[in-house]
Amino acid sequence: MMEATGLEGLESTSSPCPGSTGTGLSWDNGTRHNATFPEPLPALYVLLPVVYSVICAVGLVGNAAVICVILRAPKMKTVTHVFILNLAIADGLFTLVLPTNIAEHLLQRWPFGEVLCKLVLAIDHCNIFSSVYFLAAMSIDRYLVVLATARSRRMPRRTVHRAKVASLCVWLGVTVAVLPFLTFAGVYNNELQVTSCGLSFPRPERAWFQASRIYTLVLGFVVPMCTLCVLYADLLRRLRALRLHSGAKALGKAKRKVSLLVLAVLAVGLLCWTPFHLASIVALTTDLPQTPLVIIVSYVVTSLSYTSSCLNPFLYAFLDHSFRKSLRTACRCQGA
């Protein structure tokens, strides 16, 4: 299961590491709720289920609304909305399995069996990769649109069908990226004989565990973020050149085409996921003791990454006029 970010160091142990989406990969001898964290923070036992429940409820309702509106409204059949739809599906799937995290936390054991353990861990890890890669797809699409507009060119190849194909490729890539975690996922008994859902690596466990962190960090953050940084740096350079050589008309038109919605979704995604991956770097490079402060920071970072799954619908409602209009129409139809 996804747990605290694991800011604590990696200790040598023969037990499987707790399951996680990559945030809570602390190297210890149990889950986050029994052996991982001692009892000096009993407030977490009450607070975490409340936070997770709010995220789950808001995320399920919000993403379900996004999916229904985009599928039913003719005006929402655009390239950008294809990517938004897939991002909502990914976030919705994650919030759908979040109750298992809540149940595990309250029961302090895994009660759901091997099959559901593998499924939940797979969806957990899918959320890491799918979120960032659909954000990247939206940003790359916006980059190409701005460049084409600035050059007064059309984009006949930019179609909804191609966006669907690109989305399918993202899902296939994410599935391949998650397969290694699915292979090692399973139910085990920790040293306290408590049933847990986690990742069971072969020996040497420490090396495998470190490799899993690096794998998630590189594929789930470094590669897509470096790509986006290069693209946006190139975009700024080109727009600056247009201002110098082509006059303000093309530049103004290009600026108008920059989608505030895409930039806002990207910014929120980075805000929610950057601390998550920075925590992985800290865990790989330092050996922090399991102090109350480290435990609290770990859970805060984990909860922040969870929050990304429920914030996007609010951005669409505030920044996307067509989405607001279609949502109001759908609500009126339901009321009638």
Curated annotation (Swiss-Prot):
Function according to Swiss-Prot or TrEMBL: Interacts specifically with a number of opioid ligands. Receptor for neuropeptides B and W, which may be involved in neuroendocrine system regulation, food intake and the organization of other signals.
UniProt GO molecular function: G protein-coupled receptor activity; neuropeptide binding; neuropeptide receptor activity
Cytoplasmic compartment residues: 69-80, 147-165, 237-256, 317-336
Superkingdom per UniProt: Eukaryota
Keyword terms: Cell membrane, Disulfide bond, G-protein coupled receptor, Glycoprotein, Membrane, Receptor, Transducer, Transmembrane, Transmembrane helix
Membrane spanning residue stretches: 46-68, 81-103, 128-146, 166-188, 214-236, 257-279, 294-316
Membrane topology per record: Multi-pass membrane protein
Membrane-side (Extracellular) residue stretches: 1-45, 104-127, 189-213, 280-293
PROSITE patterns: G_PROTEIN_RECEP_F1_1, G_PROTEIN_RECEP_F1_2
Low complexity: bias regions: 12-25
Family: Belongs to the G-protein coupled receptor 1 family.
Name of the protein in its database record: Neuropeptides B/W receptor type 2
The encoding gene: NPBWR2
PANTHER family reported in the protein's UniProt record: NEUROPEPTIDES B_W RECEPTOR TYPE 2 (PTHR24229:SF18), NEUROPEPTIDES RECEPTOR (PTHR24229)
Glycosylated residues, chain numbering: N29, N34
Disulfide bonds: C117-C197
Recorded GO CC terms: neuron projection; plasma membrane
InterPro entries: GPCR_Rhodpsn, GPCR_Rhodpsn_7TM, Neuropept_B/W_rcpt
Species whose genome carries this gene: Bos taurus (Bovine)
Ranges for region Disordered: 1-25
Compartments (UniProt record): Cell membrane
Gene Ontology biological process terms, A to Z: neuropeptide signaling pathway
